[in-house]
Design a protein with these regions (language model features):
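Active-site-proximal beta-alpha loop/turn segments in soluble metabolic enzymes
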Residues: 182-191, 226-233
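Outer membrane beta-barrel
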Residues: 23-186, 194-200, 205-214, 286-290, ...
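Sec-dependent signal peptide recognition
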Residues: 2-8
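Alpha-helical transmembrane segments and their juxtamembrane interfaces
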Residues: 12-13, 82, 121, 273
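Short, electropositive, low-hydrophobicity segments enriched in small/polar residues
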Residues: 42, 117, 190, 219, ...
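Hydrophobic h-region of N-terminal signal peptides that target proteins for export
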Residues: 10-18
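Basic/polar N-terminal segments that are highly enriched at the extreme N-terminus
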Residues: 5, 18-27
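Outer-membrane beta-barrel pore domains
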Residues: 48-52, 71, 88, 99-103, ...
Length: 359
């Protein structure tokens, strides 16, 4: 009996000591700063285009993210896109963001990894904050969403390294000037550089008053891709490095729940189909006004893209809509668009309804 009591006592003491040790186990400090978040965008669209009627529910985006800081000076983020299929890289679940940024100095920050290209005001915006049923056509076609070069859908992202910063503070502590410039593979997300030639993308904007910024952006580079061209002997296909030279002019005013933004983007360089020529451009202008501040908004957007920089190749959306925030992280959006496609001599109506949530 004494032996049994002794064994039981020793076992209890061992368990108590083990529990005490566990209480003193400390996680690395950077783990305490890790934030888990995500969002989803459920979309319904219907259009009455002649001989191509559509109406469908879809998951526009579903994403999960981890982000945090290491030693205060370093910020990092990993973001996954979950919606899609497993049949192709373009549409399968995939990594969209994976980067770290050294942020010790406000006027000089260094970012490396996979992230949004520093081109235009709209491209880096969160898709819910951006305000409409999709990014504008010129941003989609000329910043790497459904790019005219045939680049895989990359949501405006690439792999590379960039520097950026803000400086020239006024008396209130607000910076007057922002700059950013980076070097990238030029192939979009999750891709190596296929021609060993890098893209250089940069931008700068001034902020002369609170809420207002006016900027300009430039982009030069190449993409190694398959092209087709119609010749006297018939269609010719080959793989080659195709030049991309692009610029954007941008202006935005965002203050007290009001937003007005306009951008013009120009591109020189052949599309995947060379018959479309080597020039394209597009522009958009939008306004978002509060009906109930931080609760309900009405909005309008004029969105035009010319695939060959001619009016005959233009596609234009005339959009109006509204959104209502059911809570801070849940909102409903309704939009109507009249669409004019000059290339196909067609005009039609489009209705979009979305439920967006964050956590």
């Amino acid at each position: 009996m004494k032996k049994i009591m002794m064994i039981a006592l020793m076992t209890a003491m061992t368990l108590a000591a083990s529990a005490q040790e566990k209480k003193h186990i400390e996680l690395p400090a950077w783990l305490n700063n890790v934030k888990f978040s995500g969002y989803g965008m459920v979309q319904y669209q219907a259009l009455d285009k002649e001989n191509a009627h559509e109406n469908s529910f879809q998951l526009r985006l579903v994403r999960l993210a981890l982000e945090g800081r290491i030693q205060q000076d370093w910020y990092w983020k990993l973001q996954l896109q979950l919606n899609g299929n497993t049949s192709s890289l373009n549409a399968s679940p995939r990594i969209v963001d994976a980067f770290a940024e050294w942020q010790k100095y406000e006027f000089f920050k260094v970012k490396a990894g996979q992230y949004k290209r520093p081109f235009t005001f709209e491209n880096p915006m969160h898709p819910i904050t951006q305000g409409f049923m999709s990014y504008s056509q010129p941003v989609s076609k000329l910043a790497g969403f459904s790019d005219r070069t045939g680049e895989q859908s990359s949501n405006g992202r690439d792999i590379g390294v960039q520097i950026q910063g803000d400086f020239l503070k006024d008396n209130s502590g607000r910076n007057w000037l922002h700059y950013q410039v980076g070097v990238f593979n030029g192939e979009g997300i999750n891709q190596k550089d296929k021609d060993n030639k890098k893209d250089i993308i940069g931008g700068m904007w001034v902020m002369p008053m609170k809420g207002l910024r006016i900027g300009a952006f430039g982009w030069t580079g190449t993409r190694y891709m398959a092209t087709t061209e119609t010749t006297e002997q018939g269609p010719v296909s080959k793989t080659e490095s195709v030049r991309k030279n692009r610029y954007a002019l941008s202006a935005e005013y965002a203050l007290n729940d009001w937003t007005a933004r306009a951008e013009y983007i120009h591109s020189q360089g052949f599309a995947a189909n060379k018959d479309k020529g080597d020039k394209a451009d597009g522009w958009y202008a939008l306004a978002i006004a509060p009906v109930i501040k931080n609760k309900m908004h009405v909005k309008a957007r004029y969105d035009c893209y010319r695939d060959q920089k001619t009016w005959a190749s233009s596609k234009t959306y005339y959009e109006v809509g509204a959104d209502y925030l059911l809570s801070k992280n849940l909102q409903v959006n309704l939009e109507y668009a009249r669409v004019n496609e000059r290339a196909t001599h067609s005009s039609y109506n489009l209705v979009d309804v979305e439920l967006d949530f964050r956590f």
